[in-house]
Amino acid sequence: MIRYLLFVFFALVTCVGNGLAGEYQLDWHVPDEELIYHSCGCADSCWVAEVRQAKAEKPFIAKLRCDCEKLYFTDKTGVERVVAENCDELNTDNKMDLIPERIKQLQSHFNPPR
């Protein structure tokens, strides 16, 4: 009985934790891909936006993140680069619209079409 109660408790904690993490799907108009955003602190100045291949074994495509100070971009090669010394240009009321635009810009810069 105690094991069952512990299992239920940890399941609830996990569900509540995931709900508080607040993953949001942003507009991303690329077939079979999705853009997921979540905040990680600093009054929403720490955040991660990740482009994933929907329903894929290796879903990672790109990531843009702010650590409350600098802006980082990681492409499908897995190399993380500092792309701005601060996140001010994105941490505005239009953040959810600006993030997809910036990811597309960085993808074309670091992964130009062949």
For each predicted feature, which ranges?
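Positively charged n-region of N-terminal signal peptides that target proteins for export
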Residues: 1-5
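Flexible, solvent-exposed short loops/turns enriched in glycine
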Residues: 59-89
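Secreted/processed peptides and extracellular or luminal domains of membrane proteins
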Residues: 46-48, 72-74, 93-94
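N-terminal secretory signal peptides
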Residues: 19-63
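Extended, compositionally biased eukaryotic interaction scaffolds
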Residues: 12, 20-22, 111-114
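C-terminal partner/receptor-binding element of secreted or periplasmic proteins
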Residues: 78-114
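Bacterial N-terminal signal peptides
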Residues: 6-15
